[in-house]
Amino acid sequence: QPLVQVQGKWIHLQQGAIEEAKRLFKDGATTTMPLVEALRLARGDGDDSHALSIGGLTSTGWVRELLESTSGNETLPEISQPPKFEGQLRPYQLTGLRWMAFLSKFGIGTCLADDMGLGKTIQLIALLQHERIEPTHLMGPTLLVVPTSVIGNWERELDKFAPEISVHIHHGPDRPLDTEFRDLVAENDVIITTYGLVHRDRETLNQISWHRVALDEAQYIKNPPTKQAQSIRSLKAWHRVAFPGRPVENRLVDLWSIMEFLNLSYLVPATTLQITIARRNEQLIGTAS
C-alpha cells in the first residue's frame, strides 16, 4: 500500500483514490454529475463506493438555490388558488399545491400520499392550472397514467375543475401512434393512458419529452423487475408525481420501486437494499438470541 510524506507526515493513499483523482484532473479538475448525486453530496449522503471523498460542492443558478434549500430553512412559495380553477382548495390542499410547485421547479419527484378522499386529484389539477398562469422555466405536456377503471373519473374532474386544460385519452384499439400521436400531444395539455399501454406503446410514448409523468394508484409499479414498472421508469420527464393508493404492504422494496420512479438512482439499487435489510435482520436475530 502506498505511503507518501506530506509536510513531514506520512499519509496512506488507497489505490482507488489515486486513480479517481487522476481521472478527475485529466478531465480538467472539474466534473459534472446528475442532480440527484449533487443532492446526496449537499446533504452529506455521498456514495461510499467512491474511492475519493468530496471535500466541497460549488453550484450556481437554480441548482445553488435548490441545494441551499436543503438546509432546513426553506419556505414554500407563496401561491394563491389559481385563477379559473373551478373549485375551492382547502388549506391543506393549498399547501400541497405549493409543495408540488416547489419540487416541480427543480425537477424533484413528488409522492403525494394523502389519505383517500382528501383530494389528491384536485391538487394535481390545481398545479396544472397554476402552471398555465405562471409557467415554469420548462413546460410541456403531462402524461397521466391511471388504472383503466378511473380514466373517466380523471377526464370528468379535469373538465370540472380546469375546463381550459385540453385532454386526450390514449386508449382503445384505434388509438394513434407515432407521428399521429406526437401531433395530438402537441395540441393537448394532458394525455391520459393506462399502465398496460405504457409498456405496449413504450416506443411511441418514449418519443416525447414529457414535462410531467404522474401515476395514480402508483402501487401498480411496486414490483421493480416487471416490464410494466421498467417501461414507466424509462419515460423521459422533467417532473414525476406518484399517488400511492394504499399503504405499503409487506415489502420495503415496494416503496423503493415508487421512490426509484420519482427520482431515478437517488436511492441505492434494490439488490443493495435487500442485502442491507437481510444483514440487519440477521444482526437483530443474533442479538435477540
Regions found by a protein language model. Give the residues of each.
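Charged, low-complexity intrinsically disordered regions
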Residues: 1-66, 255
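ASCE P-loop NTPase motor core, strongest for the SF2 helicase catalytic module
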Residues: 55-285
